[in-house]
Amino acid sequence: MAAMFSNTRSVASSSGHIVEFKAGRSRLEAGSGDTMRKVVAEPKKGLVFIKQSNDMLIHFCWKDRETGAVVDDLIIFPDDAEFKAVPGCPDGKVYMLKFKSGDMKLFWIQDSTPDVDKDLVKKVTDALNKPPTSRPAASRSAGSNANTDRQSAGGSLISSSDMNAPLGGIDQGQLMSLIQSLQGGNSDTLPISSVPRGEDASSEADCEPSTNAAEEGSSNPLSLNNPAIQQIFNNLGRSQKKEVAVSLATALSNETVAEVARNHAEELAPHLPTSDDPARELSETVRTPQFRQAADTLGHALQTGQLGPVVAQFGMDEATVGSANQGDIRGFAANLTKAEGGEDAAKTQNSDDDATREPEPKRNRPDNEDMDVD
């Protein structure tokens, strides 16, 4: 599924790491008592690093320093996981990355630097929950290559894919600055006002048409009179009015989903590798970080309107395909439920959009977070 949307979601890594430290992986084993757990360190030398890719997603990675291979590459969303020291560890060098789903990753510090673990929890927490939000500024071309660079960039700005996409999160102010920089600061064609961001879109640019505005609009691909540029701004306005995005991974991590998977294990089993206990396999699968990442990829594609053509190929009804094209995840769920014969359930869902069912509290089960370590 990820390859299906690879053209619009870049995964190229940015230069440098936000946080990094030498650490190996650890695992939990049964201890000497029912409530005891033993942390066993793996001998391989490793490196934990956090990076932000060009699509602004945060990656928590573990690399084998002996082979150079990145073994773990987890996409972490804000407040999706917590990094903390393992309580009860004698030397205080064992840390856990615990997800809200209950899964966890354990690491032991291998760095010999005395202050490596000083404020380590805060540094990692800030990197995961408060990632940088700025994008690299567009650099201006100089000399005789400037016109060629601007024409190349202008061609990409008015391509059909850019007109229909949300431009990777660029707002109107950033787009105006980008176009100005591509023009080399030529304010006659696209003047930029100093009005702070947050004003109406009409106040972002003070466009005083010149006497030859019509000629400029037809000859300059970066003129505001160009229909392609106008279409981009129209799409930006519509994208900024959309509702707050819904995390599909959070919705699917609900205990109700795991229960449904267990109850329909026989129907879902043909889609899984051979297993002696399909119900248990399904229950574990919907709680894994890999499942959450796949759900987030699907949710992103659905809420940005990229899933519409794919849904249409499955013979979905017009209302369901329309919701997918509009990026309306709630409408898509309601229409899909109705199309599958669950009209009453769809009505109930629409009336309870903001209600979230909390999982039942755990009873008489030890929590690994509060474990005693041998």
UniProtKB/Swiss-Prot annotation:
Main localization of the protein described in the UniProt heading: cytoplasm
Domain Pru: from-to ranges: 13-131
Key word Cytoplasm present: yes
Record field: compositional bias (Basic and acidic residues): 354-368
Disulfide bonding pattern of the chain: none
GO biological process, one term: proteasome assembly
InterPro entries in the cross-refs: DEUBAD_dom (IPR044867), Rpn13/ADRM1 (IPR006773), Rpn13/ADRM1_Pru (IPR044868), Rpn13/ADRM1_Pru_sf (IPR038633), RPN13_DEUBAD (IPR032368), RPN13_DEUBAD_sf (IPR038108)
Region entry Disordered, spans: 126-166, 187-223, 334-374
Skewed-composition ranges (Polar residues): 141-163, 209-223
Keywords in alphabetical order: Cytoplasm, Nucleus, Proteasome
Domain of life (superkingdom): Eukaryota
GO molecular function per UniProt: endopeptidase activator activity; proteasome binding; ubiquitin-specific protease binding
Ranges of residues in domain DEUBAD: 239-346
Compartments reported by the entry: Cytoplasm; Nucleus
UniProt note: domains: The Pru (pleckstrin-like receptor for ubiquitin) domain mediates interactions with rpn-2 and ubiquitin. Preferential binding to the proximal subunit of K48-linked diubiquitin allows ubh-4 access to the distal subunit.
Subunit structure: Component of the 19S proteasome regulatory particle complex. The 26S proteasome consists of a 20S core particle (CP) and two 19S regulatory subunits (RP). Interacts with deubiquitinase ubh-4.
Protein's job: May function as a proteasomal ubiquitin receptor. May promote the deubiquitinating activity associated with the 26S proteasome.
Protein name: Proteasomal ubiquitin receptor ADRM1 homolog
Name of encoding gene: rpn-13
